Amino acid sequence: FIQPLDSFRPSKTMPVVIYLHGNSSSREEGMQYVPLLLKHNINAFIFDFAGSGLSEGEYISLGYNEKDDLEIVINFLSNQPGVGRIGVWGRSMGAATAMMYIYKDNRIKASIIDSAFGDFKVLAKQLCKKVKNVPEFLVDVVYYFVKGSIKDRCKLDLDTLRPVDYAKLCQ
């Protein structure tokens, strides 16, 4: 949680932006934005999702379980003195996380959704198409087996990773 010293605070309460990093990244990704936020009298809360950076955990879930991390952070910030309005800034996986969570929490007053994927299955197929000479039926077969393996290991159905379904619920 990054905020100015009391002697530099323009008011007792200040808004805070929670930065949500992307896949294969960590809280370090968001540190570059701290000077910008503080310049505009906005506190910053930057953390590692479970399974990323210095956090415990073995796997990331591209937003599915990370939305639980976001809820914990919002609950924490809501009880901190000096915290005003709460905003969320997500990039890539962090943006997908935000989309899958913010619709149900009216404590979030603003959001920046940067480069979220809309549907994991569509994204996976698009990425596989970049590999030359791989027939589409083979992509479907591999996706089927990978999906089963992830469901067994992580209890996550990849077909439910569709942040686009939550976009229409956000206001």
List each language-model region with its residue ranges:
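Alpha/beta-hydrolase active-site loop
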Residues: E29, I60-P81
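Alpha/beta-hydrolase fold nucleophile elbow
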Residues: Q80-S92
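The serine-hydrolase catalytic nucleophile loop
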Residues: M14, I18, N23-L36, F49
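Short beta-strand/loop motif that positions the catalytic acidic residue
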Residues: L169-Q171
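Proline/glycine-enriched tight loop/beta-turn segments at coil->beta junctions
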Residues: L5-V16
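Conserved alpha/beta-hydrolase
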Residues: V34-E56
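Hydrolase active-site cap/lid region
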Residues: M100-L156, D165
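Glycine-rich nucleophile elbow surrounding the catalytic serine of serine-hydrolase chemistry
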Residues: G90-M100
